[in-house]
Amino acid sequence: MQASIESTGNLERRLTFTLPQERLETHVGGRLRELARTTRIKGFRPGKVPTKVIEQRFGQQVRAEAMEGLLRETFDSAVREHSLRLAGNPRIDQGETDFDFVATFEVVPDFGDIDVTTLSVVRATAEVTDADIDQMIENLRLQRRIWNPVERGAQAGDLVALETWSQAGDERLPADGVETGSSVLGSGVMFDQIEKGLEGLTKGEEKTLSVDFPAEWRVPQLAGKTVQVHVKAVEVSEPVLPAVDKEFIKSFGVKSGDAEQFRADIRTNLERELKGALMNRLRREVGEQLIAAYAHVEMPPRLVENEARSMLAQQVEQVRRSGRDPGQVPADAHQGFMDAAAKRVLVGLLVGEVARRNELRLESRRVSDTLRLIASTYEEPEQVIEMYRNDPQLMNGLQSRVMEEQVIDWIAERAQHTEQSLSFQDAIRV
């Protein structure tokens, strides 16, 4: 194979290689002959279509497919021959001839010795208690609450329907009329100064509150200012919670309406949530230790920038879902994610390197268990499992996640670690 490699940066390489023309022509010829035997074309007997006709119809497509396959095969062979380990996908450009190509790519940095036994990891532990189940049932009751209007003053837990307008200096917001809304006192949805000011307010009562708006507030006219907010309680309502009876239990999918089965199902769901939260805590803990130990290692610049752009894309999507205009996000906003992206790339490459050096293999049993766990959150688990198994992209994502968790566990088991006992609520507060 004709191939040469050169360094164009600390972690960037340029690979120049030539495709074997004879192999390409052999593959194209073989594929065209196969099509001549199997293709049905009006006016010709099966298997008797002239090669020229086949080439006219399919030659360009067959050659393009053969070129693409041989290009990938030749590139992969050259990478193995030169013992290169790529960080990200290559950019492959046409060379001087139709069979010459130049691939530019980044390689995994040299981490030197990776001794995970020097890391110090805090491993959180927690369990689901009866009190946690009781709290979840109370939360479910709150979800099904109804509101009963009252004539007394508003207190914590009450729903207050409001009309408001604000005065910021000489500017009134809105310029005409009022804004309407509602808030449950104590929920933290509104500023503390407003919530406290609403306490004791009765239906129809009005009040003016002095409110300090933060500098980053989304309404420029209010940001960083002390504003006079005029509020009127249109209605005050207290919550009425349903009894935990058979009908209530059945509404959450327990057909028997049995209270013990209801609690057992809640325990299963909470334990699943807890397992995920503890893994996220461990992933973050191990990641922070790896970053501290290997922050001096240079990361592939293009890989970091791609990660930063991916993080920005996630933020833009969040902005869009919130109803705001994603066009307000600056085009170069990804620069603000570069530090976080570099850390994420560092951890990802290190996890892959630990797996490679220690010959860690994906555990199919763990993949199956994780898939069943995911599927159990849906009404038709078997359909979800089938969907994953029939979708290579979904399965690849699942396998990558499981492999990462295996490596995180492997590192944590060998690192210096201490256990930290947490309550369920503290554990899931990641």
Curated annotation (Swiss-Prot):
Keyword list, A-Z: Cell cycle, Cell division, Chaperone, Cytoplasm, Isomerase, Rotamase
Database matches in InterPro entries: PPIase_dom_sf, Trig_fac, Trigger_fac_C, Trigger_fac_C_sf, Trigger_fac_ribosome-bd_bac, Trigger_fac_ribosome-bd_sf, Trigger_fact/SurA_dom_sf
EC number: 5.2.1.8
UniProt GO cellular component terms: cytoplasm
GO MF term (any one): peptidyl-prolyl cis-trans isomerase activity
SUPFAM superfamilies recorded: FKBP-like, Triger factor/SurA peptide-binding domain-like, Trigger factor ribosome-binding domain
Main location: cytoplasm
Location relative to the cell: Cytoplasm
Pfam families noted in UniProt: Trigger_C, Trigger_N
GO biological process: 'de novo' cotranslational protein folding; cell division; chaperone-mediated protein folding; protein transport; protein unfolding
Domain PPIase FKBP-type intervals: 157-242
Catalytic function, reaction form: [protein]-peptidylproline (omega=180) = [protein]-peptidylproline (omega=0)
Protein role: Involved in protein export. Acts as a chaperone by maintaining the newly synthesized protein in an open conformation. Functions as a peptidyl-prolyl cis-trans isomerase.
Family: Belongs to the FKBP-type PPIase family. Tig subfamily.
Comment on protein domains: Consists of 3 domains; the N-terminus binds the ribosome, the middle domain has PPIase activity, while the C-terminus has intrinsic chaperone activity on its own.
HAMAP family named among the record's database cross-references: Trigger_factor_Tig
Record protein name field: Trigger factor
